[in-house]
């Protein structure tokens, strides 16, 4: 270690840390007990990490393989100490783990806070505050740590005001000691019974023993003795019988594995025996974490082998579209030295993943069927992620599709409550397709001119405005034998929903307007693939549609916004022969004026579907000329 690092240094927190600390102290003050839960949870993680690293290097245990967490307090000094003999931290790890919040989206998260204490408490809980929660009850925190395998210790200290000090320290053994110097008015925590009841309430399920000194009554007060007692049950909750676990225990264990403040929506606890032996305890959260849409973020499944922690972001155990699932899988078959590479090619893991996915889908189906209000909450939080499923998981495509919910013209609100099953139950007699439209906003979808004939005939259309919807409909082309059909692509063929007389009249109109169609095509040139008469419009003069096998206008815009190349397919302009503007066009003989009218029709249709004009100045000039 260089001489520079052997002296005391004062370093500044990241700006976001400073802001978060202040917000947290105010927002979470009513839930002070979570401080102990968070710090014990971190100590438990440190022990898990030591066990895992010791699989490759047993010498890391030294002479101390009996892992535990110790909680003590000092009434005179007004301190609480949480100690563990886990992995410990090096100086660099202290800076990275405690001086920084190494999470993408931190600024955005902070901007989303409202100033409403109850709401902000939930948001901060979703963010996961961990160590920083200490400052809710402490005005100074001292952390002394020594990494397993190292002889050097480091002391970190801060009042949470904006900077912290780091200096070399003396520590006889590996692990971490955290001393909380309590704020004025927090003396309720300097009480043996209070601390033990908090530990039993929040941390009973921690697999490590959490020890405190036994206390006895002496001179009218409780005083600690020299004898240790284990405060928690210290057994793997998931390994116990379901009938022995209370709802509260399940909920507290969820908060431990997920670092969430809210109770989960539902969970599934299973012991599998036979070809593979494993236990799974899987939870569906009730709130989405702030970084849900970051596909690179850590997954939420902790993998254990025979109760030994292996890793806490085992992405091989759950597909991307279920990345919100939290929980534990404990296998009896995998080798203890299992690596990520082995996991990628393990048949056992593949079988566990397949079964776990089915379990999660069953949980969701059960919610949707028996607790629709709860499922509506789930959908609001995680629906857009579930929509990634049909494109990722071919084997379960139909089951996932059955869980999807959409807005539609049935209620004409942006609430996504319509399932494919609901839609099919309301289909018109003779209707063969499930109709939908994609757009970049609900308003654009709801007011699209493409819906006019469907509204007139009372045919329901799904209104898809999430970015993921384009990806969804490209991979989900039918449901329950019914084709999914975009109302903005290809020829409009309503099949049996139109009678022969209507079709006959349409054919006559197309023939009558053929010369006008050809003139508009000539005026627009390469801007369009084709011009044709439409019967999908009742109020608008024109609309743009994509060819049956072309990208929709909305998808093309999404890809361009993401910086991706597009095939550059041209749209089809459809004109409404019953509209006054189109009828007047037939009588325009001035070719320059006619060309302006044709371009205006095209530009208006482009704007109506949410597109951007290539030449806004030319559009304004033409509009001004018409108004003059």
From Swiss-Prot:
Region (A) residue spans: 1-340
Taxonomic superkingdom: Bacteria
SUPFAM superfamilies: ATPase domain of HSP90 chaperone/DNA topoisomerase II/histidine kinase (SSF55874), HSP90 C-terminal domain (SSF110942), Ribosomal protein S5 domain 2-like (SSF54211)
Record key words, sorted: ATP-binding, Chaperone, Cytoplasm, Nucleotide-binding, Stress response
One of the record's GO molecular function terms: ATP binding
Signal sequence residues: none
Quaternary state and interactors: Homodimer.
Protein name, UniProt field: Chaperone protein HtpG
Species annotation: Methylobacillus flagellatus (strain ATCC 51484 / DSM 6875 / VKM B-1610 / KT)
């Amino acid at each position: 270690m260089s001489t520079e690092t052997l002296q005391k240094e004062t370093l500044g927190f990241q700006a976001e840390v400073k802001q978060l600390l202040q917000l947290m102290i105010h927002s979470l003050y009513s839930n002070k007990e979570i401080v102990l839960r968070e710090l014990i949870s971190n100590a438990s993680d440190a022990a898990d990490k030591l066990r895992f690293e010791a699989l490759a290097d047993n010498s890391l245990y030294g002479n101390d393989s009996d892992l535990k967490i110790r909680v003590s307090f000092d009434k005179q000094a007004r301190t609480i100490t949480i100690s563990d003999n886990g992995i410990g931290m090096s100086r660099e790890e202290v800076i990275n783990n405690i001086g920084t919040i190494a999470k993408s989206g931190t600024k955005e998260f902070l901007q989303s806070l409202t100033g409403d204490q109850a709401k902000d408490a939930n948001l901060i809980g979703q963010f996961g505050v961990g160590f920083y929660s200490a400052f809710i009850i402490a005005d100074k925190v001292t952390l002394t740590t020594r990494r397993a395998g190292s002889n050097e210790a480091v002391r970190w200290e801060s009042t949470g005001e904006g900077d912290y000090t780091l200096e070399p320290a003396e520590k006889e053994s590996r692990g971490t000691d955290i001393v909380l110097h309590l704020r004025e008015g927090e003396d309720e925590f300097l009480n043996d019974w209070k601390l033990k009841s908090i530990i039993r309430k929040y941390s009973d399920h921690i697999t490590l023993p959490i020890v405190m000194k036994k206390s006895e009554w002496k001179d009218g007060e409780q005083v600690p003795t020299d004898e240790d007692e284990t405060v928690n049950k210290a057994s793997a909750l998931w390994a116990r019988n379901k009938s022995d676990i209370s709802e509260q225990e399940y909920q507290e264990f969820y908060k431990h594995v997920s670092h969430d403040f809210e109770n989960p929506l539902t969970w599934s606890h299973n012991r599998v025996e036979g070809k593979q032996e494993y236990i799974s305890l899987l939870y569906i959260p009730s709130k989405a974490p702030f970084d849900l849409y970051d596909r690179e973020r850590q997954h939420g499944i902790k993998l254990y082998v025979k109760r030994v922690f292996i890793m806490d972001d085992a992405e091989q155990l759950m597909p991307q579209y279920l990345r919100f699932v939290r929980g534990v899988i404990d296998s009896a078959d995998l080798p203890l030295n299992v690596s990520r590479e082995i996991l990628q090619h393990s048949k056992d893991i593949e079988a566990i993943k397949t079964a776990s996915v089915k379990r999660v889908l069953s949980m969701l189906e059960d919610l949707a069927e028996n607790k629709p209000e709860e499922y509506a909450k789930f959908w609001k939080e995680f629906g857009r992620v579930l929509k990634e499923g049909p494109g990722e998981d071919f084997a379960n495509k139909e089951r996932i599709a059955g869980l999807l919910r959409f807005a539609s013209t049935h209620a004409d609100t942006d609430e996504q409550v319509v399932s494919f099953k609901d839609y099919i139950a309301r289909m018109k007699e003779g209707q063969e397709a499930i109709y939908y439209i994609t757009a970049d906003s609900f308003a654009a979808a709801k007011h699209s001119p493409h819906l006019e004939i469907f509204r007139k005939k009372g045919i329901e259309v799904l209104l898809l405005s999430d970015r993921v919807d384009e990806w969804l409909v490209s991979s989900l082309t039918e449901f329950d034998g019914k084709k999914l059909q975009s109302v903005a692509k290809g020829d409009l063929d309503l099949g049996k929903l139109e009678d022969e007389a209507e079709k006959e009249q349409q054919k006559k109109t197309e023939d009558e307007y053929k010369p006008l169609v050809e003139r508009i095509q000539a005026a627009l040139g390469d801007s369009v693939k084709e011009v044709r008469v439409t019967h999908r419009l009742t109020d608008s003069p024109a609309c743009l549609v994509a060819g049956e096998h072309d990208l929709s206008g909305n998808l093309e815009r999404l890809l361009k916004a993401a910086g991706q190349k597009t095939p550059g397919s041209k749209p089809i302009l459809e004109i409404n022969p019953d509209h006054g503007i189109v009828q007047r066009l037939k009588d325009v003989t001035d070719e320059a004026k006619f060309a302006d009218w044709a371009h205006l029709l095209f530009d208006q249709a482009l704007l109506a579907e949410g597109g951007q004009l290539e030449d806004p100045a030319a559009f304004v000039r033409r509009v001004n000329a018409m108004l003059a």
